[in-house]
C-alpha cells in the first residue's frame, strides 16, 4: 500500500479544507494511505514538518504533496528525492523540478490551478457586473504569493479600462480580509469614496470583507452593501451556495488539485508513467459570464 503525506497551508480556509477532503477521498478510492498536515500559514513550520518526515529513521512516505506557504523548499525537495520520496508541488511553479527529475527515480512534478485564467475570469466578471465601469475594492492574497500575483495579473488583463481598482491585502482567510476591510472603511477618505463592487481572490476573504461592511457606520454600510461582492474557489457547499443565497454575486470555481496530484503520483509510482512537469486544472465562472451579463 502506498502512503502519501499531504501538506497544506492552513485549515482556516474552505478551499484548503476541500483540498484535504478531496485528498482523503481520492486516497480511499485508490487504496492509498493519506496523512494530511497543516502549516498554519507558517513557512518555517512547514519546512520543519516536511524535513522531519523526510529524515525520519523509520517510516517514510512514498510521496509528499504540498502547497507552499512561502518558498517551494528546494533543499527539502532534494532531500526527498535523495531518499526516493515522490515530490509534488501544488499551485506553484518551481525551477528545481527539472533537476529533481534528473536526480533519481522518484517522480516529481507540479499541479496547479490556472491562476492567470482565474484572474482573467474575475476581470470578466467585473465587466459583466459593471457595464458602465466603476470603483472596485480588490482583496488580494499575500504580497509574496505567486498565485495572488498571477490572479492579479490576469484580472488586469481583462478588466475594462473604466474599472478602477483599489487593492487591499489578505491572507486567504475570512478574518484577515475582515481586518483589512474594517481598517480601510474607517479612513475618512474611504468613506467619501463610491464603491461599486468588492472582489476578493477567494470566497472566504469576500465574506470577511462583507462582514466588515455590515458592521460599519450605517451610512457607509447601506451604500456599500448594495454593491456586488465576488470571490473565488466556488466550492459547492460554500461559494456556490453563497451565490445562490445572494450573499455573493459570483465566484470562480477552482477544482481541488489534490485529486489530480494523487492520481498522477500513483500512476507514476505504480505504473511507471512519466508525469508532466506541470499539470493545470481548469477554472470556470459561477454563474456563467453569459448569465451575469443579463
PLM-predicted stretches and their roles:
Residues 2, 139, 158-159, 253-294:
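Hinge/cleft segment of the Venus flytrap/periplasmic-binding protein
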Residues 15-30, 118-122, 146-163, 176-180, ...:
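Short, solvent-exposed amphipathic alpha-helices that sit
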Residues 50-64, 190-196:
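Short acidic/histidine-rich motifs immediately flanking catalytic phosphotransfer sites
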Residues 66-85, 155, 166, 170-241:
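Hydrophobic alpha-helical
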Residues 1-22, 26-30, 34-50, 67-71, ...:
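Extracytoplasmic "Venus flytrap"
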Residues 46, 109-136, 177, 181, ...:
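Hydrophobic alpha-helical segments within soluble ligand-binding/sensing domains
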Residues 76-117, 236-241:
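Flexible loop/hinge segments that line or gate small-molecule binding clefts
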Residues 28-43, 135-138, 159-178, 225-226:
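Short beta-strand elements in bilobed, periplasmic/extracellular small-molecule ligand-binding domains
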Amino acid at each position: 500500500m502506498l502512503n502519501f503525506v499531504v501538506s497544506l497551508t492552513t485549515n482556516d480556509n474552505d478551499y484548503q479544507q476541500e483540498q484535504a477532503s478531496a485528498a482523503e477521498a481520492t486516497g480511499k478510492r485508490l487504496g492509498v494511505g493519506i496523512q494530511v498536515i497543516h502549516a498554519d500559514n507558517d513557512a518555517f513550520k512547514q519546512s520543519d514538518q516536511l524535513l522531519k518526515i523526510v529524515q525520519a529513521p523509520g517510516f517514510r512516505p512514498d510521496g509528499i504533496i504540498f502547497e507552499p506557504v512561502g518558498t517551494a523548499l528546494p533543499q527539502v525537495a532534494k532531500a526527498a528525492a535523495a531518499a526516493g520520496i515522490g515530490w509534488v508541488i501544488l499551485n506553484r511553479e518551481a525551477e528545481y523540478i527539472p533537476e529533481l527529475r534528473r536526480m533519481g527515480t522518484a517522480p516529481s512534478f507540479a499541479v496547479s490551478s490556472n491562476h492567470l485564467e482565474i484572474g482573467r475570469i474575475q476581470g470578466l466578471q467585473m465587466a459583466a457586473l459593471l457595464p458602465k465601469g466603476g470603483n472596485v475594492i480588490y482583496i488580494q492574497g499575500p504580497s509574496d504569493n505567486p498565485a495572488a500575483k498571477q490572479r492579479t495579473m490576469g484580472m488586469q488583463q481583462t478588466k475594462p479600462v473604466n474599472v478602477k481598482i483599489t487593492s487591499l491585502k489578505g491572507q486567504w482567510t475570512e478574518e484577515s480580509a475582515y481586518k483589512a476591510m474594517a481598517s480601510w472603511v474607517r479612513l475618512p477618505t474611504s468613506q467619501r469614496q463610491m464603491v461599486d463592487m468588492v472582489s476578493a481572490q477567494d470566497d472566504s476573504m469576500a465574506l470577511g470583507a462583507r462582514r466588515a461592511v455590515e458592521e460599519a457606520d450605517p451610512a457607509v454600510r447601506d451604500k456599500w452593501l448594495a454593491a456586488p461582492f465576488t470571490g473565488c474557489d466556488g466550492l459547492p457547499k460554500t461559494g456556490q451556495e453563497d451565490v445562490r443565497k445572494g450573499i455573493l454575486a459570483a465566484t470562480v470555481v477552482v477544482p481541488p488539485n489534490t485529486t489530480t496530484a494523487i492520481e498522477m503520483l500513483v500512476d507514476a509510482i505504480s505504473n511507471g508513467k512519466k508525469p508532466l512537469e506541470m499539470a493545470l486544472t481548469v477554472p470556470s465562472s459561477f454563474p456563467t459570464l453569459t448569465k451575469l451579463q443579463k
